[in-house]
Amino acid sequence: LSDVVLGFDDVAGYESDRNQYFGCTTGRVCNRIAQGRFELEGITYQLYLNNAPNHLHGGNGNSLDKVVWRAQEQAAADGVAVKFSYHSPHGEENYPGNLLIDVVYTLTEKNELRIEYRAVTDRPTPVNLTNHAYFNLAGAGAETVLDHELQLQASRYTPADETLIPTGEIAVVQGTPLDFTKKQVLGTRIGELTESPFLGYDHNFVIDRQGAGVVEAARLRHPGSGRVLTVLT
């Protein structure tokens, strides 16, 4: 057994500059908002530019990854659970509305980890929560993930500008280092991403799907251990 989700051993690590959202709940809005600005019901809101010139993962000092949540043990029919709750007041990080958030982590008897989100607000406001886990299927402490094999059910992606804001175009992955329609080792073509701001993979892929129902969108495998991570949507 190995710990395949990366993080720190103490609170100090999570409070340090080394913490890039390891395992946290991000929000109020995950990912980037261009120029930190949005309009809602005729009102323009200017958010903190913590990833200048954009707003990233909810802002600066009071984004959801930096505040203290209230923890409470909760009954679960199929395992053990803990509920984390937080009240984000109106105007926090310049977002409108009071927002009451519950995030419930359940460890089931089948060794499944289930994360459930619930948010209630008293006025219209954007909310887009996610978990920001980092995975290394070789185990925490392994030096690289570049030996992992990735396959995506995605023949297209959304190109982004130099600040990682999508341009609005939808482009094909064929003939580019972003082509994972067939299984490919992560390190094989990552060096070709010379136009990426981070010289690596940080892209939005457009999933190929037909009809309704749950489908597999991604499969990641570590050859050395045989561990596999699948993403369903």
Residue ranges and their predicted role:
Residues 1-233:
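An exposed, glycine/acidic-rich loop-and-rim segment of catalytic or binding clefts
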